[in-house]
Amino acid sequence: MPMSGRVRIPDGISSELASAAGCALRTVVHGFDRLGRLTDLETVVIQGAGPLGLFSLAAAIRAGAGRTILIGAPAKRLDVARRWGADHVLNIDEARDPQRRLERILDLTDGLGPDVVIEVSGGATAFPEGLDMIRRGGRYLVIGQVSGESVSMKPSVFTQKHIQVIGVLLGAVEHYYKALAFLSANRERFAFDEMLTNRYRLDQINLALTAMQRFDEVKPVVIPEVG
């Protein structure tokens, strides 16, 4: 509906998925709009395995990335990433040392590093880690940094490696429209419902938040009703 700030949910898309698209996928779509074209010669590393990370994986695959690597935890989320088509996953619960993760990524990219890194973990220390792993001339899409926490880094890395850094927060109604269209066009390619985990009543919302903090949930669904 032009000029209204409202979009129509496509047939076959549940209210739960449409809600997820209104935040996580809308942000990813905005980020990919700003990131630009991907080619089948490029490797994309995604830092984070939550809704932003899984949507970024799907978007990178559909955008034509040659290879995708997802870093995150817990194992159940990485299993979803594998089923969706990630070429490699790296479990941070099994590789807690950043240097070990860097070495693994370099091994997978012939020592060059990835062409594109997408930060969606929300962890401040992920940012300098991404800068370390990205190849010369690479692009770094930063979506997850909202905490305001400070980290140590060397600004010279931007000039020495010719890195382009792109920051994105949320998106406009046009990105929500594109997000819903993405769900509709790719619902048979990716089992998006795998992200929607347990359902909670409104009076159980604190239970849902606690479960998310424990990483027991990917995207819990809160139903606007009470017991």
Model-derived features: where do they sit?
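Residues at the starts of beta-strands that form the adenosine-phosphate
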Residues: 43, 66-68, 139, 164
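NAD(P)H dinucleotide-binding glycine-rich loop of Rossmann-like/cofactor-binding domains
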Residues: 1-47, 97, 190
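Hydrophobic/small residue at the entry helix of a nucleotide-binding pocket
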Residues: 27, 52, 60
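Glycine-rich Rossmann-fold phosphate-binding loop(s) that bind the pyrophosphate
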Residues: 24, 48-51, 73, 145
